[in-house]
């Protein structure tokens, strides 16, 4: 698996990119917070140097959760860790947290996500038109690096009917939900509902911001994440516990 680490802080943060991005989506925040955490930055399947599935079913959200678990087990079993997701990365985290026996994080950073992919319209078409929509959305979000359009299309076909609303109340970890007030991809109502559904979540709404808060609102997002990480104790006694 293609994983890069950055930073020197005592906490580890596993940061998950969105449906069209790569780990580069997180780089503006990572560069700002290099002193606050050691960042574990995987490229999920179909991106960067990670595997490219031959079977379209391997773009299911559960397989992305496999990638996340592999990154955690490779890089975080000896340290306190936080999970951070942007856009689809939030959905990957929510899917991962449904698992029994998986290492649990000390906290969650959930940016520009949704608790119900079935109620989003990231793409409206299929076939060749979906590929064109993916190219248009990539340009709109100003992604530094982008996933192959076929990988994006295959992923969307697998995940577009998913709904995590029913599992939120079972998530005990502290969380911060960061969302743009004018997000056209994951409307702010999704972020508010996500924060309300979790057991203990704070929320920070960025006035006038859209979907690309990591790159367009880096300073404000980084400030909120720093405050949240400061609230998570990187105690040497911490072990990633599993849910039995």
Regions found by a protein language model. Give the residues of each.
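Flexible "cap/lid" loop of the alpha/beta hydrolase fold
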Residues: 91-135
């Amino acid at each position: 698996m293609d994983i890069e680490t950055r930073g020197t802080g005592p906490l580890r943060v596993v940061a998950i990119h969105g449906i069209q991005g790569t780990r580069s989506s997180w780089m503006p925040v990572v560069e700002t917070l290099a002193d606050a955490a050691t960042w574990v930055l995987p490229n999920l399947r179909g991106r960067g140097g990670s595997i490219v599935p031959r079977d379209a079913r391997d773009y299911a959200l559960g397989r992305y959760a496999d990638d996340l678990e592999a990154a955690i087990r490779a890089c975080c079993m000896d340290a306190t860790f936080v999970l951070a997701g942007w856009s689809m990365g939030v959905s990957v985290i929510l899917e991962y947290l449904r698992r029994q026996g998986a290492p649990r994080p000390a906290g969650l950073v959930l940016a520009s996500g949704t608790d119900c992919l079935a109620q989003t319209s990231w793409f409206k078409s299929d076939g060749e038109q979906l590929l064109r929509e993916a190219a248009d959305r990539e340009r709109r979000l100003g992604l530094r690096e982008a996933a192959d359009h076929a990988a994006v299309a295959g992923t969307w076909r697998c995940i577009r009917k998913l709904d995590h609303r029913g599992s939120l109340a079972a998530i005990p970890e502290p969380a911060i939900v960061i969302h743009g007030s004018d997000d056209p991809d994951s409307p702010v109502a999704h972020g508010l509902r996500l924060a309300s559904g979790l057991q203990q979540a704070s929320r920070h709404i960025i006035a006038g911001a859209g979907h690309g808060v990591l790159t367009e609102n880096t300073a404000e997002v980084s400030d909120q994440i720093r405050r949240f990480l400061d609230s998570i104790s990187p105690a040497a006694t911490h072990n990633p516990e599993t849910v039995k």
